[in-house]
């Protein structure tokens, strides 16, 4: 049976994550307050950030930058801005 959470990002009740995907207190906060849909949105943005900014996940500073962007996206309602990226037109 799936869990329902009030998603902080989407501002609605939605299906919650099946298990904690991120370590520590932040991981618990994500598990309790972020839906699968919002997490999938973040994963897409995260991939873009890593690729466009050429981030190295072995670099502590790059991981901190990604974590800051994640908190801003999931909890502060800020979108990820990548310099030079133009979304495809419909």
Swiss-Prot record:
Role noted for this protein: Could be a mediator in iron transactions between iron acquisition and iron-requiring processes, such as synthesis and/or repair of Fe-S clusters in biosynthetic enzymes.
Matching InterPro entries: Fe_traffick_prot_YggX, Fe_traffick_prot_YggX_sf
Name this polypeptide is given: Probable Fe(2+)-trafficking protein
Similarity annotation: Belongs to the Fe(2+)-trafficking protein family.
Transmembrane segments: none
Keyword entries, A-Z: Iron
NCBIfam families on file: PRK05408.1 (NF003817)
GO cellular component: cytosol
Organism: Photobacterium profundum (strain SS9)
GO molecular function: iron ion binding
Single GO biological process annotation from the record: cellular response to oxidative stress
SUPFAM superfamilies on file: YggX-like (SSF111148)
UniProt-listed Gene3D superfamilies: Fe(II) trafficking protein YggX
């Amino acid at each position: 049976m799936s869990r329902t959470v009030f998603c902080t990002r989407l501002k609605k009740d939605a299906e919650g994550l099946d298990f904690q995907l991120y370590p520590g207190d932040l991981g618990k906060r994500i598990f309790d307050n972020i839906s699968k849909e919002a997490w999938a949105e973040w994963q897409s943005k995260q991939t873009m950030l890593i690729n466009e900014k050429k981030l190295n996940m072995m670099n502590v500073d790059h991981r901190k930058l990604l974590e800051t962007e994640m908190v801003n996206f999931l909890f502060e309602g800020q979108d990820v801005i990548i310099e030079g990226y133009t979304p495809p037109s419909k």
